[in-house]
Amino acid sequence: LTTSADANTTAFDVLAIGRSGVDIYPLQTGVGLELVESFGKFLGGSAANVAVAAARLGCTSALISGVGDDPFGRYVSGELVRLGVDNRFIVVDETYATPVTFCEIFPPDDFPLYFYRKPSAPDLQVRPENIDSAAVRSARLYWSTVTGLSEEP
């Protein structure tokens, strides 16, 4: 990792901001959620997925997002590290739970999603003071979701 002019800031190849959460996928396909007997738990959220993809391609990556102060939030934070993403910009929110998304799998191309993010989500509570502006300025690529612009903290 290289550092920017600010000695405390790492210059990332990719710095993503936006959704992170837990995706719950059925381990059976072709049946509705009401008939599924077992599920798998996976890191989810578009921004988290982008950061992980960049890390898998050998880039240094970090994520700016929020998680709840709950077991799923700890899972998200730990999975990011395990998958090679710097998690120092993950904000833990004590008010809102970490979002969970369920998916049904009907091959070849029907994958209904059910988002549990209401009344709000921790990634929508990230405030300007939670964002390291030097990290944003020094990143080779800054990637943002549009969802993050849909609600003010």
What are the language-model segments listed below?
Residues F72, V76, D86, Y96-T98, ...:
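Generic hydrophobic, aliphatic-rich segments that mediate packing or membrane embedding
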Residues S77-Y96, F106:
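A glycine-rich helix N-cap at a beta->alpha junction
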Residues Y25, Y75, Y96, Y114-Y116, ...:
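Sequence-level detector for tyrosine residue identity
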Residues T2-D86, Q125-P128:
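Glycine-rich phosphate/adenosyl-contacting loop at the front of the ribokinase-like
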Residues L1-A16, V81, P107-P153:
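Ribokinase/PfkB-type carbohydrate-kinase core domain
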